[in-house]
Amino acid sequence: MMNWDRIEGKWKQLKGQAQQQWGDLTDDDLDRVDGKREELVGVVQERYGLAKDEAEKQVQQFESSCNC
């Protein structure tokens, strides 16, 4: 979670990476997220019909892999 401040600050650049990881997310979804971690978890959960803990896990993996 320490990286999240950096992710939030670079969200415009990282939206593409997020879209690669979650291809079902729309540009509107990603704009709505606007770098907010909880919002991303919610959108991933909603789009993919996941349990909150699974969505959290995926966002954590994204956080680890984004090289921020």
From Swiss-Prot:
* UniProt-listed Gene3D superfamilies: YjbJ
From what organism does this protein derive? Rhodopirellula baltica (strain DSM 10527 / NCIMB 13988 / SH1)
Question: Which PANTHER family does the UniProt record give?
Answer: UPF0337 PROTEIN YJBJ
Q: Quote the InterPro entries the UniProt record gives.
A: CsbD, UPF0337_stress_rsp, YjbJ, YjbJ_sf
**UniProt superkingdom:** Bacteria
Top-level taxonomy: Bacteria, Pseudomonadati, Planctomycetota, Planctomycetia, Pirellulales
Q: What is this protein called?
A: UPF0337 protein RB10934
Q: Which family does it belong to?
A: Belongs to the UPF0337 (CsbD) family.
Q: Which Pfam families match?
A: CsbD
